Design a protein with these regions (language model features):
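SIR2/sirtuin-family catalytic core signature
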Residues: 1-15, 237-311
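An N-terminal structural lobe/cap that precedes and organizes the functional/catalytic core
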Residues: 1-38
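Short, electropositive, low-hydrophobicity segments enriched in small/polar residues
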Residues: 12-14, 20, 168, 180, ...
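Active-site periphery "cap/insert" segments of enzyme catalytic domains
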Residues: 23, 28-171, 238-254, 259-274, ...
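Short, charged, surface-exposed secondary-structure boundary motifs
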Residues: 168-178, 288-292
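A polyampholytic, Gly/Pro-enriched intrinsically disordered region
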Residues: 179-193, 299-304
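Acidic, metal/cofactor-coordinating or nucleic-acid-engaging core segments within structured domains
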Residues: 184-243
Length: 311
């Protein structure tokens, strides 16, 4: 019987690792309080309540797509000094853009750096010995950054860490939202899309505009691009793994949350294994019903091919 195991964060939590995003919240708050404040200020625009901010961390990757860019612009306008101001200096050509970059870079670069150091600490925690029976000859698709499969279960082959492995310093850990950013158009793109006459009219209309504003929009656009999880690209880069699943007869899903962000991977698994039996873990009764709904109505798995079990 050829098997595929799909491993989610609940697998590490089951083994006692403090790997929830709530734990990451505490880590960020201690190690970079300024970043913590920026996350809760700009990534949860709909509410200021403590309960709502906890929800932000519960669905942290999705929350990266909640950037309140209007609030970000309002903040940066404090650094947008009018041309001809009595105190004008050349540095004012860049203060608006710099204030935007400081925040967007912290929500991208600093956040990812801190994620890696946190996972490195998590990965040092010795997992408890409540082992789950696993088939060493199976294939493994892991959504975790940690080495629990390798260290506790002594598995070493046929494991794809689809979002990266913390020990691989040469690759970036994949983290992001699912909102595909709109393509940004360069001045050359705009020029090529118009007739010469229309382009001259366009330039005349923009003649009085502040170029710092346009540069600021590029900075915000870069945030959306850099924080986007391009699942199609990730699948394409790992197509060899998915193409090798055609003979899989059983799929064992352990500790996966079935986040909408990651459903593209599961669609690809289903495409390769249309007749496989699914054995799926859940933690709460609410999850049990939600997972069944996703499997049947979104992924198209036949109901008689699904078994759910409590973990």
């Amino acid at each position: 019987m050829k098997k595929l195991y799909i491993i989610g964060n609940g697998f590490d939590l089951y083994h006692g690792l403090p790997s929830s995003y709530y734990s990451f919240r505490d880590y960020v708050k201690i190690h970079d309080p300024e970043l913590f404040d920026r996350i809760e200020m700009y990534l949860y625009p709909t509410s200021n309540s403590p309960e709502a901010n906890l929800d932000l961390w519960k669905i942290f990757e999705e929350s990266l797509g909640n950037l309140d860019d209007d609030k970000l612009r309002d903040f940066a306008r404090n650094y947008l000094v009018e041309y001809g101001d009595d105190d004008w200096s050349e540095d004012y050509n860049f203060t608006y853009q710099r204030s935007l970059s400081e925040i967007t870079d912290s929500l991208n670069i600093q956040l990812r750096d801190l994620l890696r150091t946190w996972i490195q600490d998590v990965d040092k925690v010795l997992p408890n010995k409540n082992r789950i029976p696993l088939d060493k000859d199976a294939k493994y698709l892991s959504f975790n950054y940690t080495h629990t499969l390798e260290n506790l279960y002594e598995l070493s082959k046929d494991i794809l860490h689809i979002h990266g492995l913390v020990s691989d310093e040469n690759s970036q850990l994949t983290l992001g939202h699912s909102q595909e950013p709109k393509p940004r158009r360069t001045e050359e793109d705009i020029k090529n899309s118009m007739s010469a006459e229309s382009y001259e009219e366009y330039k005349e209309e923009r003649a009085g505009d502040d170029p710092r504003i346009y540069e600021g929009e590029d900075i915000i656009g870069e945030y959306w691009e850099n924080s986007y999880k391009n699942t199609s690209k990730i699948i394409s880069e790992n197509q060899f793994f998915f193409d090798d699943l055609k003979d899989i007869e059983e799929i064992h899903v352990i500790g996966l949350s079935f986040s909408p962000i990651d459903l593209d991977y599961l669609h690809e698994v289903c495409r390769q294994t249309p007749n496989a039996k699914w054995y799926v873990s859940f933690h709460t009764l609410k999850e049990k019903e939600e997972f069944r709904e996703v499997l049947i109505n979104i992924l198209g798995v036949k109901e008689n091919n699904i078994q759910l079990f409590h973990l």
